[in-house]
Each structure stands twice: as C-alpha cells, then as structure tokens.
Design a protein with these regions (language model features):
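Extramembrane terminal tails and long inter-domain/linker segments of multi-pass membrane proteins
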Residues: 1-9, 135-148
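Hydrophobic alpha-helical membrane-insertion segments
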Residues: 69-85
Length: 148
C-alpha cells in the first residue's frame, strides 16, 4: 500500500483531466479530428487507470457492471434513435438534414447525438472488457482451463 502512494496521488490528479479531455474530444469531434470512438476510448482509459491503481473492486464501486450495461444500451439507443427520428421526420435513416430547420443545423445536431451515442457505447464496451478480464482470479482460470 505505501509503495503506491505516489501513483495514487498522481492518478487522483490526472484522472479528472483525462475524463475532461475525453469530453473535449467528444464535443470537438463535430468541428475537427476526434469524435465518439476516440472520446470513448480516452474515457475508458481514465477508468482503467483508476482500476489499475485502486483495484477492480473499487472501480466497480464507482461504476457497477449493471450501470455499464445500462450505458451500453443507452449508447446504442441514442445512435439508433437519431436514425429513427430521421425516418419519422420524413428523411432516410440517419438523414440529419431533417432534424432541424436548416440542413446545416440538422447535421450539427445529428452528428453530435450520434457521436455521443458512439462514445458512450465504446467507453462502456472497453470498460466491460477490461473488468471482465482483469477481475478474474487465477483460481477461476485454473478451474476453467486446468493448470499449466
């Protein structure tokens, strides 16, 4: 525990900035490089850093497996909901032009919402994969695959 004090202090300082940078990449993705996938991976990297430093159990207290599943569903529903909204408003699936009064405004709204859905889904997926793999105990592995 004592040998990790520097890592714990530095990570407590860095993690909020990592998550803030993920939000910047998310919202800047409409105007330049970046977007949902990149932001989702950066956000998940911040969570994974927390899990590595403080442990997977402590990280799961912050974001439970059930909450991660809910985020997965919300991300997919947001993405597909924008597509369905385009159909209901008289356009094609994922036709952003019909989402606002002007085509440019509709594209802006549509891209932000779709990229946000992608970001949520990617972050939740990467977090789920990490916690599933990192949360296994060696005994469980040996029972399932035998001793090597």
């Amino acid at each position: 525990m004592r040998q990790k004090i520097i890592l714990r202090v530095i990570s407590k300082f860095l993690i909020p900035y990592i998550l803030l940078f993920a939000l910047y990449v998310q919202w800047h993705g409409d105007f330049g490089p970046g977007g949902g996938f990149q932001a989702g991976v950066i956000f998940a990297a911040g969570f994974i850093l927390y899990a590595i430093i403080f442990g997977v159990r402590k990280a799961r207290e912050v974001l439970s497996a059930a909450a991660t599943r809910i985020l997965l569903v919300i991300g997919v529903l947001l993405y597909s909901g924008v597509g369905v909204a385009g159909i209901l408003l008289g356009g094609n699936y994922l036709d952003y032009n019909v989402l606002a009064d002007t085509p440019k405004g509709g594209q802006h709204i549509g891209i932000i919402l779709v990229e946000f859905g992608v970001g949520i889904t990617v972050a939740a997926s990467v977090i789920t994969i990490f916690c599933t793999l990192a949360g296994r105990r060696p005994e469980e592995y040996e029972e399932e695959y035998g001793e090597n």
